[in-house]
């Protein structure tokens, strides 16, 4: 990889990915486009940042004419199922239009697109929320560009990623981030439903390490493998997550539109992170800092 574009490269996974890309490919030209729509402002030296939307027509033309990207990591999106349910039009518009823009660049440069797909699309027999719908639309656009125009596409499926610099989406944050906030505010952990929903929590360092392996995998380069799953393969219930925090909890009415269980059936690479150990260590450090 010599010329790399990362959309959403200031965010949680994107920021860690850019760190790793810079370390692994110090001579590569790395360009990040991020409109900071979602929390995150991580930047590093030696990387070109455009703090704007990939949908901006002027920026899009500059990216097409000024650079020649061989690789595009398309991570920019409006995430979080619960937020999407509240803001459906914004979610669908942003996730679909940004994907079309990325395909336009890839067509111009013959780029390989690595697309951040949602693991939830595998579990909904019917479309139950705007986020999943937007990702399905985006997938169809990518499929069209792949079949009709020869753009190479690899789908990346992420499973409940957690770790340092995890984005703060307020009430829409991931369960690990949200529970950290509740502990910090000394408020009970809010569990929607009865806490039996399971998620395949995966450490961000494991994810980006395996993303680097993915880019060098000949099966992916030659199109033999189209889908890559970044998940530990060991789902954990929300109740178990709450118990690891060892904090007061309260149960609330369930939220519609969410899968009962997400489970990575075909993990790509190795995964060393254990979410329960991560939480236990975080809580221990939090208590020590609070006491001091």
Place the predicted regions along the sequence by residue.
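Short, solvent-exposed loop/helix junctions and linker helices
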Residues: 7, 93-96, 169, 173, ...
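Conserved alpha-helical elements of sugar-nucleotide-dependent glycosyltransferases
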Residues: 13, 98, 175, 237, ...
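Short beta-loop-alpha junction of Rossmann-like oxidoreductase domains
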Residues: 40, 164-167, 260
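Structural element of the ATP-grasp superfamily
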Residues: 102, 142, 179, 267-268
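Glycine-rich "substrate-gating" loop/helix at the edge of Rossmann-like oxidoreductase active sites
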Residues: 128, 159-173, 193-205, 219
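Hydrophobic alpha-helix immediately C-terminal to the catalytic Tyr-X-X-X-Lys motif of short-chain
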Residues: 137, 141-145, 175, 179, ...
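C-terminal substrate-binding subdomain of Rossmann-fold SDR/epimerase-dehydratase oxidoreductases
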Residues: 184-292
